Amino acid sequence: MRYALAACLLLLAASSFVDAKKKKIADDELGELLDNIDADEEKKSVEPAKNPCEDHQCGWGKECVVGKKGEPTCECISKCPELDGDPMDKVCANNNQTFTSLCDLYRERCLCKRKSKECSKAFNAKVHLEYLGECKKLDECTEEHMAQFPERMADWLFQVMKELKKRRELHKLEWEELLSEAENDDEKKHVYPVIWKFCELDTKPHDKSVSHHELIPITAPVIPMESCIKPFLEGCDANNDGNISIKEWGKCLGLKEGEIQERC
């Protein structure tokens, strides 16, 4: 059963979450959307545009509004885009509350943080994405499943790398070369994919560590099918400093000391 789930995870992770048939959110898109949740604005190094908001990016759940003096400001988005009712648009928050979309979740968060009258529940000021899809009762993460998780995840990542290479979406020639090595070496096929995924997650910011926030793009799509992934990955933070180093990541996923290498 669990290996069948691993196959499902591969299909989920290796394909886009938004396509013509199933409107899901891709890992990279999800990471981009969550990158500036609480940011007010970000200036781009381009020439000033006529519209002050053109050069400013607001956090998710917010929109740029031109102030009375012509200055761009970020306000809670007035209305989220209307959707067609696809259940895959729904998201589950960390308080087990289902929202119509990511936009609605972070609009509510924004309104509540600013103590707006439109805020439905004050405690939603700290709400954030838990996983994609409507909230539901998740399977129990047993000790047995947790113990098996490192090997299953390493194998899953290897399959994901192979699929991305086939689709020419495995960025950087170095990873393609390492994958070719791994395909002919049983030991390396559980080493290189683990290091690759660490580098994929360590982007916002790229500081040679992975925060719990940076884990969201990998946990949010998978939690509904694999309840062990979040507690397992959070447990990789051995020193409880809020960040997972490459050594913590490698050790957590079963790599030996000499196999953990910095390649980001």
Curated annotation (Swiss-Prot):
In this chain the Kazal-like domain maps to 68-137
- Taking every annotated instance into account, which residue ranges of this chain make up the domain EF-hand? 224-259
Listed as disulfide-bonded, the cysteine pairs are C53-C64, C58-C74, C76-C110, C80-C103, C92-C135, C141-C228, C236-C252
Q: Tell me the keywords, alphabetical order.
A: Basement membrane, Calcium, Copper, Developmental protein, Disulfide bond, Extracellular matrix, Glycoprotein, Metal-binding, Secreted, Signal
Name the glycosylated positions: N96, N243
Identify the stretch annotated as signal peptide in this record.
Answer: 1-16
State which tissues express it. Answer: Expressed by body wall and sex muscle cells. Probable association with basement membranes.
**Localization annotation:** Secreted, Extracellular space, Extracellular matrix, Basement membrane
InterPro entries cross-referenced by the UniProt entry? EF-hand-dom_pair (IPR011992), EF_Hand_1_Ca_BS (IPR018247), Fol_N (IPR003645), Follistatin/Osteonectin_EGF (IPR015369), Kazal_dom (IPR002350), Kazal_dom_sf (IPR036058), Osteonectin_CS (IPR001999), SPARC/Testican_Ca-bd-dom (IPR019577)
* One Gene Ontology term, aspect cellular component: extracellular space
Family as reported in the entry's similarity comment: Belongs to the SPARC family.
Q: What name does this protein carry?
A: SPARC
Organism per entry:
Caenorhabditis elegans
Q: What is the lineage of its organism?
A: Eukaryota, Metazoa, Ecdysozoa, Nematoda, Chromadorea
